[in-house]
């Protein structure tokens, strides 16, 4: 089983990740990790932090001669902004200067609850770990699972369908064409846009909306589409709640900072339709697997992959730090006050789509390993190919 942990504060010396359970024998190049980190940093509407950081991961263990060796993989990403925070974020030295405590929480952020839960008199420790800066470590860790899945013929891609009022959720013909080439083709096309949209008109509308929000001191959220191609039938199970594939994928997406909703297939539209208009009918032709003309289930039925493209949708709320702050209060005096302002982005939806690709990768990798078993890549692929052959045999007449 692949699992990972991250550590580090937003303005601490570094972010770290430990990845355990990665099979041996997987070829990994530095760019497999660093290209994903670079994708995460892009996107129209990002703040000044992205001008400081140039994220690259140092590999401290678990890889030898360019291949995984089955032991835990340790990754570290330097925070270049640390040099500006050595006093405020010192681990042991007591600062000689007085550092004012932050006591005015931001609505929509972890500030108030985190401060009370952990007994802080200052919001700073909450801000540092709750920050989406942590996702840099996650993207690095999960990039390893993406490489593993590629060896198994599974690709993950994403694009942004809406930012604020701009965009539309309906699938475009261009999206379907790109998916036929594999989900990675979809991501490459989205990466060509500064907002990761596929349609030029929507891109221009999104840029204008972000510009307006920035001018108003406001922020914007949006909707992200994630697609996974090449997933064989039968990953996941209905047997126990904690092994359900759809539940695990949804949990992974909801673990991303500011993601507040997840949809699989066209779930919310399905809820308003009769079953006769929802369920993906199956058609059989001699000597071939069943064919479906729709994919409203999003590639998952009974919490198992059904062989179709897996389609996930995530809703990201607007970032909680506004340059035109909302009403709040000062916890030290219990008096009304405008909320605290922290350096932040106007819109991070494009980056969130890249993070979404990352976090679903270990879920799919574990579902695959649960089906095949095995400790090294060659063994796993041999078993996967045998399983695929057995599926094909089932459908032979």
Swiss-Prot record:
> Which molecular-function annotations from GO does this UniProt entry contain?
chorismate synthase activity; FMN binding
Q: Which GO terms describe its biological process?
A: amino acid biosynthetic process; aromatic amino acid family biosynthetic process; chorismate biosynthetic process
Q: Which CDD domains match?
A: Chorismate_synthase
Q: Where does FMN bind?
A: 129-131, 257-258, 302, 317-321, 343
**Which Pfam families does this one have?**
Chorismate_synt
Tell me which domain of life the UniProt entry assigns to the organism this sequence originates from.
Answer: Bacteria
Q: What is its EC number?
A: 4.2.3.5
Pathway where it operates: Metabolic intermediate biosynthesis; chorismate biosynthesis; chorismate from D-erythrose 4-phosphate and phosphoenolpyruvate: step 7/7
How many and how are cofactors bound here? Reduced FMN (FMNH(2)).
Reaction catalysis annotation: 5-O-(1-carboxyvinyl)-3-phosphoshikimate = chorismate + phosphate
Q: Which cofactor does it need?
A: FMNH2
Keyword annotations for this protein? Amino-acid biosynthesis, Aromatic amino acid biosynthesis, FAD, Flavoprotein, FMN, Lyase, NADP
Which residues are listed for NADP(+) binding in this entry?
A: 40, 46
PROSITE patterns in the record, alphabetically? Answer: CHORISMATE_SYNTHASE_1
Sum up the protein's function in the record's words: This reaction introduces a second double bond into the aromatic ring system.
NCBIfam families according to UniProt: aroC, PRK05382.1
Q: Which family does it belong to?
A: Belongs to the chorismate synthase family.
Task: Name it.
Answer: Chorismate synthase
